[in-house]
């Protein structure tokens, strides 16, 4: 399960992309799977770019350092290391999903690695649903699995402040088409969302203090 509700102080850059959402996966026997995890890899370091003290309501962040050495300093080497271990190149993947705190970070990282828009556009949902933090990459993967065909190869890379990235090399199996119609697609959930204005958002998130 990967899910979260993004927090951001009013007026902070974090609030601009704040979202909420999650995705859950059942991990089981390969013969029953709609996608196989072929290999995983992690890249971690002691890089504090985002934090919240126990007594504070909103998190703090290191502003531009959240990009580099934070995001780019982990997502890019994690993806590169996993492809090196697998002996693959960007051209070997039909789809790619990166952690997406905003649209600029993942597209820049993906272009740096040599991926194309056709490979990442299906799973890049942040422009429509915002930054779901721990759920970001996993929700993006659901959108990809909704349309993937048997044999399609997928690269997914997460990111967590602190900091670290986990990479996953996945392959869709022949069973993928059997499960794609058993539940509403991620795209259908997005298309039926209800837009609200900022005043409604502030009230629903209880950002107005009355004392």
Regions found by a protein language model. Name each.
Residues 108-140, 144-152, 156:
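A beta-strand-loop signature enriched in Asp, Gly, Thr, and Trp
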Residues 1-2, 36-40, 91-98, 119-125, ...:
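Beta-strand segments within the central parallel beta-sheet cores of soluble alpha/beta enzyme folds
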Residues 76-94, 113, 147-148:
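Phosphate/pyrophosphate-binding loops at sites that engage ATP/ADP/AMP, CoA/4′-phosphopantetheine
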């Amino acid at each position: 399960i990967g899910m979260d509700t993004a927090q951001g102080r009013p007026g902070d850059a974090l609030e601009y992309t704040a979202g909420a959402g999650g995705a859950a996966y059942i991990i089981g026997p390969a013969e029953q799977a709609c996608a196989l995890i072929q290999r995983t890899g992690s890249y971690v370091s002691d890089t504090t770019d985002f934090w919240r003290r126990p007594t504070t309501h909103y998190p703090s962040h290191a502003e531009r350092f959240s990009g580099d050495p934070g995001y780019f300093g982990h997502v890019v080497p994690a993806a590169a290391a996993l492809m090196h271990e697998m002996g693959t190149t960007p051209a070997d993947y039909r789809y790619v999903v990166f952690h997406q705190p905003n649209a600029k970070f993942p597209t820049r990282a993906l272009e740096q690695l040599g991926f194309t828009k056709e490979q990442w556009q299906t799973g890049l949902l942040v422009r429509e649903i915002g930054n779901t933090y721990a759920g970001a990459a996993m929700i993006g993967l659901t959108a990809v699995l909704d349309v993937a065909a048997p044999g399609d190869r997928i690269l997914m890379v997460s990111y967590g402040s602190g900091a670290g990235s986990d990479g996953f090399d996945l392959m869709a199996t022949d069973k993928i088409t059997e499960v794609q119609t058993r539940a509403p697609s991620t795209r259908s959930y997005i298309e039926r969302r209800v837009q609200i204005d900022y005043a409604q958002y502030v009230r629903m998130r209880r950002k107005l203090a009355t004392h």
